Amino acid sequence: MEPHHEQQVDVFIVGAGFGGIGQAYALRNLGLSIKIIDSLPDLGGTWLTNTYPGALSDTESFVYRFSWDKEDLQTYPWNRRYLRQPEILAYLRHFAEKHDLRKNMEFNTEMQSAIWDEESHAWEIKISTGQTFRARYFITAMGILSKANLPSIPRISTFEGIVAHTSHWPNNLDVTNKRVGVVGCGASGVQVITKIAPSVASLTAFIRHPQYTLPSNDRLITPDYRTWANENYDRIWEQLKNSLIGFGYVESNRPFFSVDPSRRQQLLEDLWNNGNGMRFMVEHYCDITTNEKANEVVCDFLRNKIYQIVKDPEKARKLVPTELFARRPISNYGYYETYNRENVSIVDLKEAPIAEITSNGLRTEDGTVHELDVLVLATGFDAVEGNLVRVNIVGRGGKNLKDAWVNGPKSYLGSFVAGFPNMFMVNGPKGAFGNVVPAVEASVEFITHAIERAEAVREKNGSQGIVEATQEAEDEWGLVCENAAKENLFNKLKNSWFTGGNIPGKALGVRAYFGGLGSYRAIGISATKDTWNGFRPFF
């Protein structure tokens, strides 16, 4: 086989989900040649692979989309409060095709290495087809929830049934009348359990850390609601982009204990009956995630709801969390009610841990063999940096990104890395916490401003513009993120993916900026568009 010739390209993007599509859209009019690759067979990223039953967004439909194309916002169809996986994938395909972005994409193609060449001031990128690309700008858009977390369960290969991770659900898997076990009760576990329970012969939920889940209150939207959204999108996006978490509703500035107890209860009931997980956290009160005493009152309210809904006291006990209400909240449409079904049971893995997989099921340490036809692993992701550190990315002086991040990922503004010139990350480690799409848009804007500056330098001086965060800026941004997290109870739960604690051996640390989307945008736009603060000067 003859070797492939090295190909020149201005911008090389890895990933074709929300991040890669959004970045390609933002760069489309700059006159740059763009190459986008993705290891998957089509665009869509997380929303291409997470096809498990019940998969849907926890963000309301009117703001789970790009803000940039107003005509598209007002005309593209959606008819429910929340989008299902097929609808999100269809939207991404539509957006890419409308803006002619597919022409730059190549699928079933993995990046094998990306190495900075100091002499030519370019990235040498090798891909699985055998080709090598040389790019002036290298952009990773691999997603923060894309590398599956596969648990180490003894003898799993001996199971004669079907094993399926929710992030890679087999297309032909039909669980009807099957004996199904589900390991994990995060968002995907809650959704798949609720969806499949009515159709399976039996469902056993293996739960170690039960989480708080709230009603999504999903429903069909009315024509009047869609008209309201269309007529107010300018105001909606302005408010959203200056908000704390960017979910499209006004966030409260009311402290929890400023309200008398009876009124507090009324407001919590209103949130339970009309809100969703994120609304519950921030719409009526401003300090549920920062005031531990307020959080405990909320926890008691939620625990009481579980006992009210789940009729079997033993099942209810196993479903009641003992931790703070301090994870990204899960929204559901009948999760707790599902446990009132006779065909649904629970194994508390703290009381009876998994010992091994057998040929016909799963054996727990109390000696019980739970016979199964299908084992579903709803065990989440090696989140945030998981995909970035599994490939060979080498910056200045032979510095490998994996080695640079051995004690946890670092960045400037979640988009730039000191020592890795002209490398950018769309919504990378220490990016904004909240609605993923506006967080992606903010990061894309920072990157685009930086590339525009570099191109202006190149046009003026005839030299390659080098965008590189300083070590001081990266260190300072890390402290900013640490300080913001100190105020947030999310940081107290060390076994969550926000801290890296869901992966054995992974360095613990803050992986997001909790200071607010509005603050994040203001800091990033000032640095990349106005002051160039935090970057090495151009030469």
Which residues are covered by each model-predicted region?
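Short, surface-exposed connector motifs at secondary-structure boundaries
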Residues: 177-178, 317
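Active-site glycine-rich loop that binds ribose-phosphate moieties when present
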Residues: 166-168
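N-terminal FAD-binding dinucleotide-binding subdomain shared by FAD-dependent oxidases/monooxygenases
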Residues: 2-11, 16-156, 172, 185, ...
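Rossmann-like NAD(P)H-binding beta-loop-alpha module
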Residues: 178-200
